[in-house]
A protein has these predicted regions:
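N-terminal glycine-rich phosphate/pyrophosphate-binding loop and immediately adjacent elements
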Residues: 1-125, 285-305, 311-316, 509
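Glycine-rich loop(s) and the adjacent beta-strand/alpha-helix scaffold that form part
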Residues: 25-33, 38-43, 48-49, 219, ...
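Mid-to-C-terminal "cap/lid" subdomains and adjacent gly/pro-rich loops that border
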Residues: 39, 262-383, 519
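Short, hydrophobic/aliphatic alpha-helical segments
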Residues: 63-77, 255-261, 319-323, 485
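Conserved redox-cofactor binding core of oxidoreductases
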Residues: 106-108, 112-230, 452
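A glycine-rich dinucleotide-binding beta-alpha-beta segment and adjacent secondary-structure elements
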Residues: 177, 191-197, 231-234, 374-385, ...
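Short, hydrophobic/aromatic-rich segments at coil-to-beta transitions
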Residues: 240-246, 376-378
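Loop/helix patches that line or flank the sugar-binding groove of alpha-linked glycan CAZymes
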Residues: 392-404
Length: 519
C-alpha cells in the first residue's frame, strides 16, 4: 500500500509531536503523516488504575509500550509507542547555557554549535509555552530570559524549603527546578496534585505528547499510522532526494507499506534515527552517521544535615543551582549542574539495628525516631563531557529483528580531553558536596558514580561543514535536500543538564525551514 503526503514524519515522540503541531499552524492544510513503530496508548482514563497497580504490586505502568525484538545493546530506550519516552518522563525542563554553544571558541574543547544563543533562547520560550512549563527566574544574571515562564513555579514542599535554606548557607544559590507540569489549568490539562508518580501522571498535569497527537487528530490536521515500522529510506536515481520510505504494517501481519512525500523528517530519537539512516545507506557521505554519540556523566551522594525533614512530600521535585554552568577560561575546565532532593537514605524503619540486634515493638519506633532526628538530602551533579568520533552507534549483525534487520549497538567513548580531566572534575564536585555539608554540620555519605552517560544524544550531529557533520542547524541533511533529522540526535554535545527542552527548541526552529522548503 502506498501513502502520499506533503510531509512524512518518521517517529512519534515528543519531537514529532511538537514538529507536527507547529507545521500545521505554519501552513494550514498541509498533508502531514506521522509513522510510529509502536502502538497508540490513548488511554489516559486508565492511568489512575495503572498507577494504583504499579504502587501496589510493582506492575509496569505502561504495558505494551515496546516491541519485543526491536532492541539493541547499550543505552537504548526500549520505549516504542505514540508519545515515545516522554509518555513517562519526569518533566524536567532545564535550559542549556550559552557556553554549550561555544565550547570550542571559549575553551578549545568539543565543538561549537551552528546556532546563535539569541536564536535558541527565542525557541526555548516557544518550547516552554507549548509544553507548559512552570518555573521561576534564576538568581544568576547570565540566565536572563526574554519571556517569563508560562506558569508560576511548582510550590516548594516543607522539605524543600528547609533544604533550600540549608543549601544556601554554603553560599550557593538555588531555585526550584523548572518542569513541564501545570501549576494551574493549562492547555486543557489539570493542575498538578503532587501525586509523586510523574512516570505515570494520573491527572494529565505533566506534559505528554499523546495529548498533542490526540488534539491534532481531533482537528484532522494529520494522519497517524501506528504499529508501522519504517525499515528503509529510498533515494532518488540521482541520490539528491529521498523519494520513499518503506516498511511493514505490524497490525496487518507485516504487510509492506510505502510512504511518498515532498519532505521526510526522521524524528526517531538518538538511537533509532541514525539506525534507520545506516540501514538505508543515506545521509552518510561524511561517514559520521552514528558517530559522536554523547550524553553527560554524573556523580551523586547523600548528605546528612542538621535539620529534620519528613520525606514523602512530592519527592520528585528538586532544587537546582546553575552556578557551575559557567567556567572561567583561566582555570581548569569543569561544568556541571547541582541538584538537591529530599532523601530518606539511612532513615528507613528497620527490624535490626547496626549491631544486628532484633528490634520489636516500641524499640522499632525508638530507633526510627533517633535516626530521623537529623535529615538527609540527595545531591547529584551532571557534568559536561565530550564525545570521541569513536563514540558510536553501529549495526549489530548478531542481533536482528523479525524482518532480518540488524539492531543497533551503542558504545560511548569520551574524547581525550574529557578523560584527562575526569579525576579533577570528580575532586571538584566532591568538594562542592563537602561545602554543602560543612556549612551545615553535616557529612557526605553514599557517593555514587554512573558507569554510563545519562540523557544520551547525538549520532547525526549538526554543523556547517558537510565533511564534519550530518545535517545543518535546521536538521536538513547535507546529502539529501528533502531529508531532515530532528530531536536529540542532532545535538553536537549534551551539556550538563537535562536535554529535552533543548532538542524540542531546536526542533521547533527547524519547522519554519521545513515549511519554506516545500514552497
Amino acid at each position: 500500500m502506498v501513502h502520499e503526503s506533503d510531509v512524512c514524519i518518521i517517529g512519534g515522540g515528543i519531537s514529532a509531536a511538537m514538529l507536527a503541531q507547529k507545521l500545521s499552524e505554519l501552513k494550514p492544510g498541509l498533508a502531514i503523516t506521522v509513522v510510529e513503530a509502536g502502538s497508540r496508548i490513548f488511554d489516559s482514563e486508565n492511568r489512575h488504575t495503572y498507577r494504583a497497580r504499579s504502587l501496589a504490586f510493582g506492575e509496569n505502568a505502561w504495558p505494551g509500550d515496546f516491541i519485543e525484538d526491536q532492541a539493541g545493546a547499550g543505552i537504548i530506550s526500549r520505549t516504542m509507542a505514540v508519545g515515545g519516552s516522554a509518555l513517562h518522563w519526569g518533566g524536567v525542563t532545564n535550559r542549556f547555557s550559552e557556553e554549550d554553544l561555544t565550547l570550542k571558541s571559549r575553551y578549545g574543547l568539543g565543538v561549537d554549535w551552528p546556532i546563535a544563543w539569541t536564536d535558541l533562547e527565542r525557541h526555548y520560550c516557544e518550547a516552554e509555552r507549548r509544553l507548559g512549563v512552570s518555573g521561576e527566574p534564576g538568581p544568576f544574571p547570565e540566565d536572563a530570559r526574554s519571556e517569563p515562564y508560562p506558569m508560576a513555579p511548582m510550590p516548594l514542599s516543607y522539605n524543600l524549603k528547609v533544604l533550600k535554606e540549608w543549601a544556601e548557607k554554603s553560599g550557593i544559590l538555588f531555585n526550584g527546578t523548572p518542569q513541564a507540569k501545570n501549576t494551574r489549568p493549562y492547555d486543557g490539562r489539570a493542575t498538578c496534585l503532587r501525586c509523586n508518580t510523574c512516570e505515570i501522571c494520573p491527572t494529565g498535569a505533566r506534559y505528554s505528547p499523546d495529548y498533542t497527537f490526540k488534539a491534532l487528530l481531533a482537528a484532522k490536521t494529520l494522519t497517524l499510522h501506528d504499529r508501522t515500522l519504517v525499515r528503509r529510506l529510498v533515494r532518488s536515481a540521482d541520490g539528491k532526494r529521498i523519494e520513499a520510505a518503506t516498511g511493514v504494517d505490524r497490525a496487518r501481519n507485516g504487510e509492506a507499506v510505502e510512504y511518498r512525500a515532498k519532505t521526510f523528517v526522521v524524528a526517531s530519537g538518538y538511537a533509532w534515527t541514525p539506525h534507520l539512516l545506516l540501514l538505508s545507506g543515506v545521509a552518510n557521505s561524511s561517514g559520521l552517521v552514528g558517530r559522536y554519540m554523547n550524553g553527560h556523566a554524573f556523580i551523586g551522594a547523600q548528605i546528612e544535615l542538621d535539620a529534620k525533614i519528613y520525606p514523602g512530600m512530592n519527592e520528585q521535585h528538586s532544587l537546582i543551582s546553575r552556578k557551575y554552568f559557567r567556567c572561567r577560561q583561566d582555570v581548569p575546565f569543569v561544568r556541571h549542574d547541582l541538584r538537591v532532593w529530599e532523601s530518606s537514605a539511612g532513615r528507613e524503619a528497620r527490624l535490626k539495628d547496626a549491631a544486628g540486634t532484633l528490634l520489636l515493638g516500641d524499640a522499632v519506633l525508638q530507633d526510627w525516631r533517633a535516626r530521623t532526628a537529623r535529615g538527609a538530602a540527595r545531591v547529584r551533579a551532571y557534568y559536561d563531557v565530550h564525545p570521541s568520533i569513536d563514540s558510536a552507534l553501529t549495526l549489530d549483525a548478531s542481533r536482528k529483528n523479525a524482518w532480518g534487520d540488524p539492531m543497533p549497538s551503542i558504545r560511548h567513548v569520551w574524547d581525550e580531553a574529557s578523560i584527562a580531566r575526569r579525576a579533577a572534575t570528580r575532586e571538584h564536585i566532591l568538594g562542592v558536596f563537602g561545602q554543602l555539608a560543612r556549612a551545615n554540620d553535616g557529612r557526605v555519605f553514599n557517593v555514587s558514580e554512573g558507569n554510563y552517560l545519562d540523557h544520551p544524544a547525538g549520532g547525526c550531529r549538526m554543523g556547517t561543514d558537510p565533511k564534519t557533520s550530518v545535517c545543518d542547524s535546521y536538521g536538513r541533511t547535507h546529502d539529501h535536500e528533502n531529508l531532515f533529522v530532528v530531536g536529540s540526535t542532532s545535538l553536537p554535545t549534551a551539556g550538563c543538564t537535562n536535554g529535552t527542552l533543548t532538542f524540542v527548541a531546536v526542533t521547533l526552529r527547524s519547522a519554519t525551514r521545513i515549511v519554506s522548503s516545500l514552497i
